[in-house]
A protein has these predicted regions:
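Alpha-helical scaffold segments
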Residues: 1-265
Length: 265
């Protein structure tokens, strides 16, 4: 074949594939799904025999382009099918603007899955986290406990700041929770004697110097923790606690007793 004949042959082949994609019956569509041409696949999207299972199979292809995925998102089927919405969100090449519009349609734990998808972009992760956090006020306690165990650090932080004692153990056991979240909680308005004690006795957190000090500087901390923690502090920190204006009378007495034990007046 001469060079002049090759383009005509290629054009004819592409035309046949485009026509087949547009007109094939359901069985014929299956043979089109692996076509390397995005143009052919976009033609397939106009086929009246296209259904949800076929579209979901197509969305498993990781080589789909943004243009092709945008075309999928505009299909009536994408608006009707929850599974297609999920598949679009999961696809790494789906444009961020489309993902943003689809996230509100996902269920709570589908959003959690999005946060941990391989290749998820920072913007997509943040958007999923925000969608989860926005739903927390109406989320049942049982689901919150599961979230506290499984979710990302930002979601766990939001749950922790609620101050619900029933969420504390799950939050504290989450491997992604940050010490800074606990520090903020201990210095915030929702910390109570019960929740402070939960942190103070937790094996992972009870020996963190910054958290110890935050616990001892909180006026709601039970005095038992002064008895436990004060002997472990450097003298200068104990003196600083004596000067604190945040402690209760009973807490200050514990500090004075510790200083007296160390021979400091």
């Amino acid at each position: 074949m001469s060079d002049s004949e090759k383009p005509a042959s290629l054009d004819a082949d592409l035309s046949r594939r485009l026509y087949r994609a547009l007109t094939a019956d359901r069985d014929g569509i299956l043979s089109v799904l692996n076509d390397p041409s995005m143009e052919v696949l976009r033609s397939l999207l106009k086929n009246p025999n296209l259904d949800e299972p076929i579209l979901l199979t197509l969305l498993k292809r990781m080589d789909l382009t943004e243009d092709t995925l945008t075309a999928v998102s505009r299909l009536p089927l994408a608006g009707e099918s929850h599974q297609v919405k999920v598949a679009l969100v999961h696809h790494p090449a789906t444009p961020a603007r489309i993902v943003q519009t689809l996230l509100p349609h996902l269920y709570l734990f589908e959003l959690v899955t999005v946060c941990f998808l391989p290749g998820v972009t920072p913007d997509q992760k943040v958007a999923a986290e925000r969608a989860i956090i926005q739903r927390l006020p109406v989320t049942p306690l049982g689901n919150k406990i599961t979230l506290a165990r499984r979710a990302t650090s930002d979601v766990v932080d939001a749950l922790l700041q609620e101050g619900n004692p029933q969420l504390m153990d799950a939050c504290l056991d989450n491997p992604r929770i940050r010490e800074s979240s606990l520090f903020r909680f201990l210095n915030g308005p929702t910390a109570t004697a019960e929740t402070i004690s939960t942190i103070a006795r937790h094996s992972r957190w009870k020996n963190r110097p910054n958290l110890k000090l935050a616990i001892l500087k909180n006026g709601r901390t039970p005095q038992i923790w002064f008895t436990v923690f004060l002997p472990t502090l450097p003298l200068v920190e104990v003196k600083n606690l004596r000067a604190s204006g945040r402690l209760t009378k009973g807490q200050k007495e514990c500090v004075e007793e510790e200083l007296k034990r160390r021979g400091v007046r």
